[in-house]
Amino acid sequence: MADTTVDKLAKEVGKSADRLVEQFSQAGIKKSANDTVSESEKQQLLDFLKKQHGGDAAPQKMTLQRKSVSTLSVAGSGGQSKDVKVEVRKKRTFVKRDEAAEAELAAAAKAEEEAKAAAAKAEAEAKAKADAEAKQKADAEAKAKAEKAAKAKSEKQEAAPAQTADEKAAKDEADKLQAAKDEVAKAKADAEAAAATEEARRLAEENAKRWADEEKARKEAEKTGDHHVTTSTEARAAEDTADANAEKRGRRPRKPSANAGNNANSNSNAGSGRPGGKGKRGKDNRRDNRNSRNSRNARSVAPESMDQAFNKSAVVVKAEVSIGETVSVSELASKMSVKATEIIKQMMKMGSMVTINQVLDQETAQLVAEEMGHKVILTRENELEHQVLADRNGDVKVEPRAPVVTIMGHVDHGKTSLLDYIRRAKVASGEAGGITQHIGAYHVETGNGMITFLDTPGHAAFTAMRARGAKATDIVILVVAADDGVMPQTIEAIQHAKAGGVPLIVAVNKIDKPEADPERVKSELSQHGVMSEDWGGENMFVHVSAKSGEGIDELLEGILLESEVLELKAVREGMAAGVVVESKLDKGRGPVATVLVQEGTLKQGDIVLCGLEYGKVRAMKDENGKAITEAGPSIPVEILGLSGVPSAGDEATVVRDERKAREVALYRQGKFRDVKLARQQKSKLENMFANMVEGEVQELNLVLKADVQGSLEAIADSLNKLSTDEVKVNIIARGVGGLTETDATLAAASNAIMVGFNVRADAQARKVVDSESVDLRYYSIIYQLIDEVRDAMGGMLAPEFRQEIIGLAEVRDVFKSPKIGAIAGCMVTEGTIKRSAPIRVLRENVVIYEGELESLRRFKDDVSDVRNGMECGIGVKNYNDVRVGDQIEVFETVEIARTL
């Protein structure tokens, strides 16, 4: 390497040439600014400078730094916590002294230690010398004191009188007596201790088996018992009781030890016999004796159980909690006898945050109560109604009762005449005469028993009873004129009887007329499903004449025979129950109801709950207007005292408490409006699908009326052919002529549609249609009627659902959005992309995600749809794994209506 000049070296190191020349001279090298400098000279200068500035020596000082970072979680406002970083810095400096200073410090420390040792030695010598002098002085004083005491004692002995021989003999005698007493007491104590030990051993042997059984039962209970800890008051009380019993068993009665007592007596006697016997020493002796007595008794009595642990009741005391439809947290806590906070904690464990006033549904409250170990009893809104109706007579004797018969038929076929003849012939003389009935029901006595007849003109009460689920009639008598045959109202009566499931007896009336043709009646009735016994059927046919009385007795015998087959029985004693046959509002008496008693005995003064009304029976009258005080089963009676007019068909029940009866009646009145509104929606064609029950065959009930018999048969056959496996057409009533009130009532009771072909409904029928919201339709073309019925049946079919693809977009690029996430830049290749429609994400023609759109934009604007051939940005909700090349498919679900 070429040599450099001093001037050039000065420029390289950043110093002036004069300063560098001066440093060279100090190092013993003489140079000028223009002289060259060799490498050896540079090294010589560097060594000089290091030596001058201490660079060649070892470092005398060292500094160490350390930094640690930790994170603390600090609670902030609003119950949220935040993290705070804490940084700790430490710095330590170590200084190394030179050897001279180290030697000087070591010498100083050594000199200081030698000085301390010399001082300690001198102090020890001085202390030993002082101790020796003090000991000598104390010995001299003690010797002088002893000499003085000996001198005083000798002087005292010389001065005191000598002890006499009698006193010495008395003292010896007392010592001998005391020794004898001690020996006797010790022997007695040993004997009692041995007896106590033997008693304890005997008790242990006797109770060993019982203790073993108790221990085994306790362990079994712990294994099989419910260890779920509850916070109920009953559980805590059970634990406290178990603890108290365990403590009582542990505290066995102690027998006082004779040894201990004698020892105490001897010690007390000894203490009293000498001075200071009642001092501190005497108290200590008594305390020692008590401790020894306790220890001996503890050893002599065997414990009942060696288990020293806490005895918690293994079986949880379960309380019965009654929960209604809804209950608040505070009410539930009160029923469970716990604090509301315990329920809130339990629900927090179950994942629900509630407050003390929050209302829980029945299912949630049941889960909470069962989780806390209680037995739950679910109650309904009408629980009071069930309780009132269930609080009746218990096990009572069931006896046969009279049949209840309803007479039906065409108005011109002699139904009224037949009723009048039976009444005139069978009612005993002397009663309120006349054939005018005060009420719509009466009973007659025959030689074979009693029969109760219901007069139901227009069949209104019968239909209303069946619609309300009340079966008041046991047998139906169908009156048919022998000279007139089957008429439309006769067919209606047959349909009513079949719908109610009531046995039917046919009374062929006017048999005394010359033009009577009973065989024609049998033939016509057989076409409607009523077959005579002579023809192999099940229906009894009786030929009667309401004018001459022919066949009346046979008819009554047939009724009683049918009742025997039915085996009609009822409770005769106890609280009554029945059904309202008819009711009215009398100007002078108020609400009046005719009740047919079905079981029990109705008495004057009973509390009656009758549908929406209630009241106390103030007066009772029979069918003849005669006041009575009680009525048994199958007896019609007129009662007064109800709060309002009940409806025909309402159930009348005797209850115990008038206040509860009023509560039930008010509850029923509040519920009546909802039930009525719900009933109005049943038979609408538009709501047929809502009435469908999955898995069951649907039925479309129809009441069909036509102008001529030919059209009626053609329509009925066509409608029956429409029935399928899923929907069935059920024509519950058909006939020729206009739509009557009976047809409307039957349609309302059966949830049917009234269909009229070239006929119309009368005023009374339209009134029922309006009040019951029955669907009424008129037709003049058969095909139009069939098409609309087919459409109605199609509406009852379960619909089909189909998914149609309405758009397809291809992902060209993916962008990231801080709010939404991955945004797919797409080109619409098919159809239209709609924001509200569900989507599928396809990758290599395989569906990998199905969801919905969160964002659809074109440029920066939110749009509702994007058409084919346009670009857009698509954000998929809850999905960020969209890649380039994916396809986004937009589809919609279309409901396909099924047709027959």
Swiss-Prot record:
Region feature G1, mapped onto this chain: 409-416
UniProt region (G5), positions on chain: 545-547
UniProt keyword terms in alphabetical order: Cytoplasm, GTP-binding, Initiation factor, Nucleotide-binding, Protein biosynthesis
GO molecular function: GTP binding; GTPase activity; guanosine tetraphosphate binding; translation initiation factor activity
Positions with a binding annotation for GTP: 409-416, 455-459, 509-512
Basic and acidic residues: compositionally biased ranges: 119-158, 165-191, 198-229
InterPro entries: DNA-bd_dom_put_sf, EF-G-like_DII, EFTu-like_2, IF2_assoc_dom_bac, IF2_II, IF2_N, P-loop_NTPase, Small_GTP-bd
Chain spans, region G3: 455-458
Stored Gene3D superfamilies: P-loop containing nucleotide triphosphate hydrolases (3.40.50.300), Putative DNA-binding domain, N-terminal subdomain of bacterial translation initiation factor IF2 (3.30.56.50), Translation factors (2.40.30.10), Translation initiation factor IF- 2, domain 3 (3.40.50.10050)
Entry keyword annotation includes Nucleotide-binding: yes
Major localization class: cytoplasm
Region named G2: 434-438
Gene Ontology CC terms, in alphabetical order: cytosol
Family classification: Belongs to the TRAFAC class translation factor GTPase superfamily. Classic translation factor GTPase family. IF-2 subfamily.
UniProt protein name: Translation initiation factor IF-2
Organism listed in the record: Shewanella piezotolerans (strain WP3 / JCM 13877)
Lineage: Bacteria, Pseudomonadati, Pseudomonadota, Gammaproteobacteria, Alteromonadales
